[in-house]
A protein has these predicted regions:
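Compositionally biased terminal segments of proteins
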Residues: 1-157
Length: 157
């Protein structure tokens, strides 16, 4: 499974990360369809370089011709002028294998927790943290997720 490959590769590089998005919701018990695996890292070049290496080790390549150094140096421009919120990776031999590293969030400012899955302890953003992210994004799928997260947090789900 792609998630396990990524986590194992990140762990082998000693990279701190937080799983966010649809896979994180699934680990919190809120299952929904998603194509990609989303992560947040600490916003520093060394971490983005480790992620680039770790993802490359499992056959994933940046969708855009940019490197970790570019992301960190030009982050503000990418977000404000190019509407780029994530650094996307794909396995061109199997395009269903997709990973997004959000460049709008900093792991140092996030609340996370460890969830045990398949013999691994995966670092996941808390439901409250995911809720904040979803409220900021406000896309149609996010609005559905917001309702489900609030129900789960209130004990209704």
């Amino acid at each position: 499974m792609l998630l396990y490959e990524i986590v194992d590769s990140f762990e082998s590089q000693k990279l701190d990360y937080a799983l966010v998005g649809g896979y994180a919701l699934a680990l919190h018990g809120l299952v929904r369809a998603t194509m990609d695996v989303d992560f947040v890292l600490t916003l520093r070049q060394s971490d983005f370089e480790l992620a680039e290496k770790a993802l490359g080790n499992i056959g994933l390549k940046s969708r855009l011709p940019i490197r970790a150094e570019d992301i960190i140096k030009m982050r503000k421009e990418y977000i404000e002028q190019r509407n780029l919120i994530a650094w996307s990776f794909v396995d061109y031999s199997n395009p269903s294998r997709q990973v997004d590293i959000l460049i709008t969030k900093d792991l140092k400012k996030m609340k996370t927790q460890k969830i045990s899955v398949a013999g691994r302890k995966i670092t996941v953003a808390t439901l409250q943290e995911i809720l904040k992210m979803k409220e900021e994004a406000g896309r149609p799928q996010d609005l559905i997720d917001i309702t489900n997260i609030k129900e789960k947090l209130s004990g209704k789900k």
